[in-house]
UniProtKB/Swiss-Prot annotation:
Name of the top EC class for this enzyme: isomerase
Superkingdom: Bacteria
Binding residues annotated for Mg(2+), in chain numbering: 109, 251, 253, 255
Entry's family note: Belongs to the phosphohexose mutase family.
Role: Catalyzes the conversion of glucosamine-6-phosphate to glucosamine-1-phosphate.
E.C. designation(s): 5.4.2.10
Record's protein name: Phosphoglucosamine mutase
Post-translational modification: Activated by phosphorylation.
Length: 458
């Protein structure tokens, strides 16, 4: 663990909780315990016993962090319900249904097994706002609650919840229209050897589908390894080989969804949003004729939904910011190109399995193959390049990079756009070029990526 002065200058929370290499600061047992104590301090009010739901994905380091987080919570007099491996949205759902004070997820989502993370949900099932995360960070760094030590009967207890998985499966099935069935459909589902390895196949089978399951043999080290939402190639091959109706790809914590049509073509979050927007408009269920996406979404999404008189509100990257925009303005559909899809009429956060069920409902009602439904979305060519960096700075502090960006913007004119941003969860900068000429996009992206590499290599 770095010295206290280094820790003080290092922000714990990113765009999706605290994340890093397992057993390396800040993803250590010590920090996990401190996070638990800080969360417990914030929720302690009134004479009643307080409870926090704690779940995880299938990473090896989850055992270590689960115990440390639970120790921190119980040491402050808060009870803990340990649900074991369960999708992130499942933990959010259990938190609200159990009327718990908060929920905690131990996961690094789509990252490799060497990483891990901790993120929190409030009692209403929504992720903590930035201000609350800031309070937790201040409590951890200041040491101001170190002396608070409940004793004897005031110490919290930890329990194992044995039926959490079943509760979540029942919830998911209830979001699928009762009059519909998946009988006669063959569905390939890739669970990324992650948190949904038992829930997603079960839901689809119980609704009547013939299921071919991939990525359902987690060993603690193979989560997201050449499988799941980031690696749909094997899924696509399996769909075509078995003549399946579609393929469903989830990531390690199952909060995102990418699908593959019956021809093996990938259908991303933008296309899924376009399809579901059309369905909600037709059923007069899309609130205020608005869809929420992020700056990463393709301009083709706006063009696709414009035919129904729907407008798109864009936010910064991160499903939490999509949800914030939806709640603030009373919208009920939003998501990200990466596959975080939020159906606010059903849930409070991105849920890959739930989103798949909503898409399947559209397919059942339309009686059309996914490839035909997805044809309403025509993306403008995009190039996305990830640049590994050793440090992150404001782009305005990088004159050589800004010069290249402005040059590219001038050459693109009004025929495309440039987006350069730092990842909130990884040591990477992301360069997105959108324009009608794919080859030109690649060349422009490389120019900017090279400039970033030179400027941030030390």
């Amino acid at each position: 663990m770095p010295p206290k002065e280094a820790q003080a200058s290092q922000k714990l929370f990113g765009t999706d909780g605290v994340r890093g290499k397992a057993n390396v600061y800040p993803m250590t047992a010590e920090v996990a315990m401190q996070l638990g104590r800080a969360l417990a301090f914030l929720i302690r009010n009134g004479p009643h016993r307080h409870r926090v739901i704690v779940g995880k994905d299938t990473r090896l380091s989850g055992y270590m962090l689960e115990q440390a987080l639970a120790s921190g919570l119980t040491s402050m007099g808060v009870d803990v319900e340990l649900v074991g491996p369960l999708p992130t949205p499942g933990i959010s759902n259990i938190t609200t249904s159990m009327r718990a004070d908060a929920g905690a997820v131990i996961s690094a989502s789509h990252n490799p097994y060497e990483d891990n993370g901790i993120k929190f949900f409030w009692r209403d099932g929504f992720k903590l706002p930035d201000e609350t995360e800031g309070k937790i960070e201040e409590l951890v760094s200041s040491g101001s609650i170190d002396s608070i030590r409940p004793t004897a009967t005031k110490i919290g207890r930890a329990f194992r919840m044995e039926d959490a998985r079943g509760r979540y499966i029942v919830f998911l099935k209830a979001t699928f229209p009762r009059e519909l069935t998946l009988e006669g459909m063959t569905i390939v589902v890739d669970c990324a050897n992650g948190a949904a390895y038992k829930t997603a196949p079960a839901v689809l089978e119980e609704l009547g589908a013939k299921v071919i399951a991939l990525g359902v043999s987690p060993d603690g080290k193979n989560i997201n390894h050449k499988c799941g939402a980031l690696y749909p190639e094997n899924l696509a091959k399996t769909v075509v080989k078995h003549g399946a109706h579609l393929g469903i790809a989830l990531d390690g914590d199952a909060d995102r969804l990418i699908v593959v049509d019956e021809k093996g073509k990938v259908v991303d979050g933008d296309a899924i949003m376009a399809i579901c927007t059309g369905e909600l408009v037709a059923r007069k269920q899309l609130k205020k004729k608005m869809l929420v996406s992020t700056v990463m979404s393709n301009i083709g999404l706006e063009r696709a939904v414009a035919r129904w008189g729907v407008k798109v509100a864009r936010t910064r990257v991160g499903d939490r910011y999509v949800v914030d925009e939806m709640r603030r303005n009373g919208y009920n559909l939003g998501g990200e190109q990466s596959g975080h899809l939020i159906f606010l009429d059903h849930t409070t956060t991105g849920d890959g399995t739930l989103a798949a069920l909503q898409l399947l409902a559209v397919m059942c009602r339309a009686g059309k193959p996914l490839s035909e439904l997805a044809s309403i979305f025509e993306p403008v060519p995009q190039t996305l390049v990830n640049v590994v960096v050793k440090q992150k700075k404001e782009l305005g502090e990088l004159p050589t990079v800004m010069k290249v960006i402005k040059s590219v913007e001038q050459r693109l004119g009004n025929t495309g756009r440039v987006l350069v941003r730092f990842s909130g969860t990884e040591p990477k900068a992301r360069v997105l070029i959108e324009g009608e000429d794919a080859a030109r996009n690649q060349a422009y992206a490389k120019e900017i990526a090279d400039a970033l590499s030179k400027a941030l290599s030390v």
